Amino acid sequence: MKFFNLNALAAVVTGVLLAAGPTQAKDYKSITIATEGSYAPYNFKDAGGKLIGFDIDLGNDLCKRMNIECKFVEQAWDGIIPSLTAGRYDAIMAAMGIQPAREKVIAFSRPYLLTPMTFLTTADSPLLKTQVAIENLPLDNITPEQKAELDKFTKIFEGVKFGVQAGTSHEAFMKQMMPSVQISTYDTIDNVVMDLKAGRIDASLASVSFLKPLTDKPDNKDLKMFGPRMTGGLFGKGVGVGIRKEDADLKALFDKAIDAAIADGTVQKLSQQWFGYDASPKQ
């Protein structure tokens, strides 16, 4: 086995750094932002194939504040982080939760949205008869009483067929908290909803910011939300912009722009427009 002479290596590195001079902040003129394109109302395509939604509107607003020209591109969810780290685009705005596992790989802006998670089933499902004593459940600060209530609630899912989008915090939560439940994973949330309505699965789990607009639609009266509204834990710290770890200057630009968009009510206005309620973080 070979060993490095650490003193010699340190001297070489120091010399290289001195020769290179101080690090210069990157001057961003234009960036490319990836989004999934199939997660309404965050990001989806209109009849003409144009990307629209909350993420798109907010992203364009942030880019104006940063004085940067931005281009949105569509990227399948399962490859969205690997393609960022590979340099195929500069940022991600795709309803992506700021979660510990993801933070090991990429950096995030400050949260631009806060939304709890809850369950979805059909209007005729016996699951709706379940009584739960907890309406809001912060998983980072769960009390013994809340944990007992959650355990009692999750027991109703024995024998229930669950469907969730693959690679999401919803899948991670189900596998950790309900390992005995039968879980099917899907490439898009739209396919989850389609199978739920067709009776191929019994329930799902997603964000309220996705589920409320979904269940408010007249043609989705057969779908109902139920159960506690959960935050924190595996669901993370909110929704943020995904950025490469080495692009700290870009993160700083997004953080400043998001602060301003929250302060002047833009995030609140857009969340009311797209989700039907205020999901903006507080300053």
Curated annotation (Swiss-Prot):
InterPro entries, A to Z: Iontro_rcpt_C, Lys_Arg_Orn-bd, SBP_3_CS, Solute-binding_3/MltF_N
SMART domains per UniProt: PBPb (SM00062), PBPe (SM00079)
Family (UniProt): Belongs to the bacterial solute-binding protein 3 family.
Domain of life: Bacteria
Free-text function comment from the UniProt entry: Component of the nopaline active transport system probably consisting of four subunits: Q, M, P and T. This system is also capable of transporting octopine provided that catabolic functions are induced with nopaline.
Cellular localization per UniProt: Periplasm
SS bond list: 63-70
Alphabetized UniProt keyword annotations: Disulfide bond, Periplasm, Plasmid, Signal, Transport
Pfam families named in the record: SBP_bac_3
SUPFAM superfamilies: Periplasmic binding protein-like II
Gene label: nocT
Protein name as it appears in the record: Nopaline-binding periplasmic protein
